[in-house]
Amino acid sequence: RFVSTLAQLNPDINYVGIEKYSSVLLRAVEKQDELNLPNLRFIRMDAEAITEVFDRGEVDRIYLNFSDPWPKDRHAKRRLTSRQFFERYNIILKKDGQVEFKTDNRPLFDFSVEEVKEAGWQLRAVTYDLHNDAKLCEGNVMTEYEERFSAAGNPICKLIAVR
């Protein structure tokens, strides 16, 4: 729903949703068909191959919403906010591109803040309670997970990273 809402609000901007799992992707494609959004496409793929799909400097912004936390330390490089992934994002993002990340998982968020720095990126904005941060919450498009976790009383963390 997140990317569908963005596509509806910004018909002159193209969006590409990437999803690893077919079951999740199927629901998104059905929603896209229902809403008739010509500026929205989906790709089923593992994000590790992102540089094989997008050209250097092709992408304006990357949204990472409630990603799998891969809680075991040995799986840290699989996290979409690891420095290994920021190396990939560095290739496909335009010079002034940015990465926006939201989660309710505080350990993952703390890891991500450190990885942004270790990757040589800068934090443009950081909040540990998005819905009580008037500046960062302005224009926030909520995901289904965000609604669920927020309703359960979990604060939502958000960062915006730039090169």
Predicted region positions:
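Conserved SAM-binding loop of SAM-dependent methyltransferases across substrates and taxa
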Residues: 1-12
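Conserved class I S-adenosyl-L-methionine
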Residues: 71-76, 98-119
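A short glycine-rich, Lys/Arg-flanked "PGG" loop and its adjoining helix->strand segment in the class I
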Residues: 79-98
